[in-house]
């Protein structure tokens, strides 16, 4: 709607398309779960594909080329990374929505504390800690959230 075409309203787009950004430092594209702007884009495919799976998983895949062996490797690591249709995805999306709100309100979506829902997880195991294991924000970001709520109220 035309009344929402301004920077005073946060718009979040959810897509199943893989979003990427180009890094000038290494001249590569990197998959992203969240692309910060307004509108902010949250990619459900990016949530699954962007954070890396366990290192040993990739090593096992590189040394086993048959289709049967690949299926065995996937079984071996089942539960250690997200898959399409995974029942944990909605809980993880909540954390990305929080990151989107913080990016819009403060210009900074992420936290260095892996116990905070705003942690920028580069590995699936870290994603599970910050988004599923703890499901809370650190004290610093909890205080900022209270200020944001008070500003809106």
Predicted ranges, named:
Residues 38, 46, 147-153:
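C-terminal or late-domain output modules
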Residues 1-114, 118-122:
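Metzincin-family zinc-dependent endopeptidase catalytic domain
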